[in-house]
């Protein structure tokens, strides 16, 4: 049994990316991607999502996750690992990211994310073992809790 709010976040990722999701992920060959078919997932004994990977650098840019990170990402409160690298995600990091207090690994590099990094990330930053957001479009100023070396290379040509 899976926690419904966790499944809802996965469904929102699907809804945001419907045009670009690789159909090779359709393991039950139903011609539609369902939440439990999204790449690599690990669930705990209470039905909570603890690891989520939407990462396949071998796929073409035409077949990756796209759209925005759902605002309800903060509902994944048991998440330890979030790997969204090598996708076409756009928009800003949702403020609710600060609710992921169990997060130890956050990989958002090589996307099209931009805007400002929310200060709420400071709620979880001390937990990070690994934090990689390079090759996006994040604009300064960056939250003071994030060492500048962790920001990496950003395209700031469209920043105000």
List the model feature ranges, each with a label.
Residues 110-113, 120-159:
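Leucine-rich repeat domain C-terminal region
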Residues 103-105, 112-117:
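Acidic, glycine-rich calcium-binding repeat modules characteristic of RTX/beta-roll
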Residues 46-48, 74-79, 98-103, 123-128, ...:
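Leucine-rich repeat
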Residues 66-74, 90-95, 114-122, 141-144:
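The feature encodes a structural signal of leucine-rich repeats
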